[in-house]
Curated annotation (Swiss-Prot):
Any one GO MF annotation of this record: DNA (cytosine-5-)-methyltransferase activity
Catalytic activity: a 2'-deoxycytidine in DNA + S-adenosyl-L-methionine = a 5-methyl-2'-deoxycytidine in DNA + S-adenosyl-L-homocysteine + H(+)
EC number: 2.1.1.37
InterPro entries (UniProt xref): C5-MTase, C5_DNA_meth_AS, C5_MeTfrase, C5_meth_CS, SAM-dependent_MTases_sf
Protein's job: May be the equivalent of dcm in this bacteria, or it may protect the DNA from cleavage by the putative NlaXP endonuclease.
Keyword flag Transferase: yes
One of the protein's GO biological processes: methylation
Species, as recorded: Neisseria lactamica
Keywords: DNA-binding, Methyltransferase, Restriction system, S-adenosyl-L-methionine, Transferase
Record's protein name: Type II methyltransferase M.NlaX
Enzyme class: transferase
Family: Belongs to the class I-like SAM-binding methyltransferase superfamily. C5-methyltransferase family.
Domain SAM-dependent MTase C5-type as annotated: residue spans: 2-308
């Protein structure tokens, strides 16, 4: 039985990926500060208790576990910290991950973040993180993976950090599955008319796109149809106007994707409950992870941990 903890849990996408990959995994602790995300998390995980602010949590209150998982927010590391030669991570949420790793020493961890972390502050932020993880005793692997390489029609890239306490572990990130994707795979047959954008909004998007093109800037919206291979990245801002992912509709204005489509775009099953408003749902799925990517990484982690365990026998 593998025990995991789910930090910065959001709606539980990382946990879901681990549960799909492991038949013998149990989440023993979850932490999430956003009350609406907690509502969705609890609706899908039996209403279990979710700890609030991890910065206020005593490590003594966190159960022992085998795997720490976290989709932690990317916060700029202080210049002072960088000048100290990676000595200071305090004041960032990464520090809370670090203090739990140091206190609990789980066998492994999986951290997820935006791809931009790789180049943030000319790469120094990632160097700070890696240095601290290594000083905590972990052998660390990093990779940027794309959702569309794992059967999901979304152009979403994220960086993943996987670490093992046992340096004999031989871990490899999963390879692309080689499956063609199509936006039609996630579309509902009969979406509600309320998701069709108004004439005023559509005219505004087109005008802005023309202005941006004339100014040599990128276009202002993303238009897709069932045959498109993939969409743009769904972000937490999607609830504002939905312009990054619009779906063509014959004979009328394009529409936003629906919350169930947003869930599918992150690889959540149709059985996943969405007990919150559309605005909160878009924010939650935009903030979440691509579940099939997590599952693929978790399967590789399980294989690596099992191989080391078998060698000990």
């Amino acid at each position: 039985m593998f025990k995991i903890i789910d930090l910065f849990a959001g709606i539980g996408g990382i946990r879901l990926g681990f549960e799909q990959a492991f038949d013998d995994v149990r989440c023993v602790f979850s932490s999430e500060i956003d009350k609406y995300a907690v509502q969705t998390y609890q609706a899908n995980h039996g209403g279990e208790t979710v700890c609030g602010d991890i910065t206020q949590t005593d490590v003594a209150d966190i159960p022992d576990h085998d795997i720490l998982s976290a989709g932690f927010p990317c916060q700029p590391f202080s210049q002072a910290g960088l000048k100290k030669g990676f000595a200071d991570t305090r004041g960032t949420l990464f520090f809370d991950i670090e203090r739990i790793l140091l206190a609990k020493k789980p066998q492994a961890f999986l951290l997820e973040n935006v791809k931009q972390l790789k180049g943030h502050d000319k790469g120094r932020t990632l160097q700070v993180i890696l240095a601290h993880l290594q000083q905590a005793g972990y052998k660390v692997y990093t990779e940027v993976l794309k959702a569309r390489d794992f059967g999901i029609p979304q152009n979403r890239e994220r960086i993943y950090l996987v670490g093992f306490l046992n340096h004999d572990v031989d871990f490899r990130f999963p390879q692309p599955i080689g499956q063609a994707t199509a936006v039609g795979d996630i579309l509902e047959a009969y979406p509600d008319e309320k998701y069709t954008i108004s004439d005023k909004l559509w005219q505004g998007y087109q005008r802005r796109k023309a202005e941006n093109r004339a100014a040599g800037k990128g276009f202002g919206y993303g238009l897709f149809n069932a045959e498109s291979a993939y969409t743009n990245t769904i972000s937490a801002r999607y609830y504002k106007d939905g312009s990054e992912i619009l779906i063509e509709q014959p004979g009328k204005n394009p529409r936003k994707i629906t919350p169930p489509e947003a869930a599918r775009l992150q690889g959540f099953p149709d059985s996943f409950q969405i007990p919150v408003s559309d605005a909160q749902a878009y924010r939650q799925f935009g903030n979440s992870v691509c579940v099939p990517v997590i599952r693929a990484i978790a399967e590789q982690m399980k294989a690596a941990l099992s191989a080391v365990s078998d060698r000990k026998v």
